[in-house]
């Protein structure tokens, strides 16, 4: 009896990968049939297998035209291929176009709320920990220690959620003479690290999809990796040679610098009318506490009385007349939600923190869903090609530097690197922007945020203008030096490889992202700060063995992956150590059991195979039953 494929004249091999809960052992087809169709075809047998995700199979020359395919029961894509849908009517087409056009203003509205929620989030952190940040800055004996100064910069920037605020405080302390330029440089480095926590938090909102989360977390942590690597090289160099102090001193001495105005409000012109209705802060309280003015110790950060908006005085008005006019100006009550509540700063800060996080998460989720629906098919391909395509040869190398200029310009417009990097993080998660393109954009954002400190320094008194401008330039040259270290040559772009490794780890163990945030921005800085307070002897005694152990582990890992033959047999893997010392699997089991204790028990289902990730698949070995490499029999969850 002739089989179905023989009656058709032979099998037609389909190059498409198939998804699976059924195993097809029989002839291949020109299209992908469903299980119901296969059951009606004589000579074709299906076997149920446990599989939850696609397994891409390459074509193999099998005898009798037999191939192996796996697919889901009645997936939507296969159903569309089996039955041809009628052409949509004109009214349906118009409805689809109208829906897409309506999504654009909605998306812009959610983006506006997203940026406003970041501003309110910064205000919430300042209310909750602003005075603590001022107290930390006040102790000059601590700040004279470079390592302690670095940690102070990290913690203060995490507390106030704004590197612009922390660097402006540092510039104010330098201009008032309370802090030397050499002592302020490590704090500037720490503020650069602390500002990257915002977009890492934003990346957590895409944890629902492992692939999107892997890309988004890698795109967010590439900023962290760049800052940490730059500090590991430049902080010891600065402590030993004073490189940044001397270079910026020469630059300041060679220019005739005059005072200017504060940073221009570009994006705030749009966001402030809304955020001022929620909360208004008197940020001079934090700066006054930092410079040692105890008169404002018990003063609330919440602004109660505001000066009415008036037209700017003419430039011909004398200084005495201007001061007199300000003295005679009547103050009026501010117009925001918390002006008459009488709540303490901490309570208002916690309320705003919870509310801004809810709005932030909601806007981000809706933005991602709308971008997913808009960026489909040819539209997504065009955008990806435009953003990720390099310039034609021989100007390919210019593409990254052009992206830096774009990132710096956009950050100058929004006056916040956190806003810019948080805005591109969802696009990285969706795959619209590649990590290789996001890296120079982030570096440009690092440069763009230094303009805030430079413009704040230009507003300093004339007698302290040079020192204030010098510390602002230290911020600029620190980022330029980091770019020269970790960007020009492809082999030096370690932050990209480190970020991708972190992304893969968090895609496998999603709780690792929260652990990363706690360790890198809270526990590790606090531990280093405590050790540094015990003196340089304790710092050297603890830091030297730890640094040597870390260097040894990194070296062995590199040799294990590239040339294991150069290592002793027992050191070619970490299996000689207890499992918890070289794998997160035991901790993952504990966390899984702890979370399942609070979950409602579900009906028991057949046991699924363990999660296997592509990068952890064993070397290909022949399968005795199918005569195919083992990779093609694995199921990736």
Swiss-Prot record:
Alphabetized UniProt keyword annotations: Cell membrane, Disulfide bond, Glycoprotein, Ion transport, Membrane, Phosphoprotein, Sodium, Sodium transport, Symport, Transmembrane, Transmembrane helix, Transport
Cellular compartments annotated: Apical cell membrane; Cell membrane
Modified residue annotations for Phosphothreonine: 506, 621
Catalytic activity: 3 Na(+)(out) + phosphate(out) = 3 Na(+)(in) + phosphate(in)
Gene from which this protein is expressed: Slc34a1
Glycan attachment positions: 298, 328
GO CC terms of this entry: apical plasma membrane; basolateral plasma membrane; brush border; brush border membrane; cell surface; cytosol; endosome; mitotic spindle
Extracellular face residues: 126-145, 237-345, 435-464, 533-537
Chain positions with Phosphoserine modification: 14, 34, 605, 623
Disulfide bonds: 225-520, 306-334
pH dependence per the entry: Optimum pH is 8.0.
Family stated for the protein in its record: Belongs to the SLC34A transporter family.
Transmembrane segments: 104-125, 146-163, 217-236, 346-368, 411-434, 465-485, 512-532, 538-559
PANTHER family: SODIUM-DEPENDENT PHOSPHATE TRANSPORT PROTEIN 2A, SOLUTE CARRIER FAMILY 34 SODIUM PHOSPHATE , MEMBER 2-RELATED
Record note on what altering residue 491 to S does: No effect on protein expression and transport activity
UniProt induction comment: Up-regulated by a low-phosphate diet. Down-regulated by PTH at brush border membrane of proximal tubules.
GO MF annotation: an example: sodium:phosphate symporter activity
Known outcome of mutating residue 62 to S: Reduced protein expression and transport activity
Its biological purpose: Involved in actively transporting phosphate into cells via Na(+) cotransport in the renal brush border membrane. The cotransport has a Na(+):Pi stoichiometry of 3:1 and is electrogenic.
Primary subcellular site in the record, as a coarse category: membrane
Oligomer status and interactors: Interacts via its C-terminal region with NHERF4. Interacts with NHERF1. Interacts with TMEM174; regulates SLC34A1 internalization by PTH and FGF23.
Species the sequence originates in: Rattus norvegicus
Keyword Ribosomal protein belongs to the record: no
One of the GO BP terms on file: arsenate ion transmembrane transport
Name of this chain's protein: Sodium-dependent phosphate transport protein 2A
Cytoplasmic domain ranges by topology: 1-103, 164-216, 369-410, 486-511, 560-637
